[in-house]
Amino acid sequence: GALWWRNVADTPVKKFDLVMDVNARASYACAYHCLPHMLAAGFGHIINMSPPIHLDMVPGKVAYSISKFGMTLVAHGLAAEVKGRGVAVNALWPATVIESQASKNFGLGTPANWRKASILSDAVLAIVSHEPDALTGRALLDEEILQEVGVTDLEPYRCAPGGELIRIAGHNAVSGTFGTGAGGSVKANPLSIDNPAL
């Protein structure tokens, strides 16, 4: 996906178009091209990496939020369109900062504040373990779907002990920053596709 966390005044239309192309448009295009094959087979799972829609995350990230919420709307809308036809469409998002090149390169805390990427892969496995018609049309958090399938201990997903996880969605998430949940916060550096040629 494309990350661009800037104010509208700092987001040229060319950047907006790029973020929309990489996030919302790509999600739509992938679903459009895969859907006929899934419907013909009577089975499939489409999972978009996009958040539940909460407007408190929008200020300072309007272009990014529109692009990611667009992906979530694809999940909700398409799920309703194909309901009962053996194809599930859901959105999945981490509740906390995940160890990644983005979290490392842009100083989003330290390993003690992150979870491992394996929480997302396990969440995907939890989603696809359901029959498509049994779990569709939802915007899920990783820890939420894992708890639904009986995972009660999320500690093995921590990158390092001792720190407080930085919550970016769900319970105790702090709007506008990556909140630590304890009154403090880790300000996110603007993540961007800063190549001037873009």
Which ranges hold each PLM region?
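Substrate-binding pocket helix/loop in short-chain dehydrogenase/reductase
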Residues: 6-8, 12-17
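Catalytic loop of short-chain dehydrogenase/reductase
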Residues: 45-84, 96-97
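C-terminal helical subdomain
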Residues: 84, 91-92, 108-198
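Short beta-loop-alpha junction of Rossmann-like oxidoreductase domains
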Residues: 6, 87, 91-106
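A short helix-coil junction within the Rossmann-fold of NAD(P)-dependent oxidoreductases
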Residues: 6-7, 33-42, 81
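Structural signature of the Rossmann-like NAD(P)-dependent dehydrogenase/reductase core
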Residues: 1, 45-51, 88-93, 136
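A short, exposed helix-loop element centered on a Lys and neighboring polar residues
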Residues: 31-32, 76
